[in-house]
Curated annotation (Swiss-Prot):
UniProt family annotation: Belongs to the apidaecin family.
Its job: Antimicrobial peptide active against many Gram-negative enterobacterial and plant-associated bacterial species. Not active against other bacterial species like H.pylori, P.mirabilis, B.pertussis or N.gonorrhoeae.
Induction: By bacterial infection.
Protein name listed in UniProt: Apidaecin P
Subcellular location: Secreted
Keywords: Antibiotic, Antimicrobial, Immunity, Innate immunity, Secreted
Record-level GO BP terms: defense response to Gram-negative bacterium; innate immune response
Signal peptide interval: none
GO cellular component terms, A-Z: extracellular space
Length: 17
């Protein structure tokens, strides 16, 4: 019984300033 790895959600693209 191994824990399921949950990857972090993808981050939104950084807006160009």
């Amino acid at each position: 019984n191994r824990p399921t790895y949950v990857p972090p959600p993808p981050r939104p693209p950084h807006p160009r300033l």
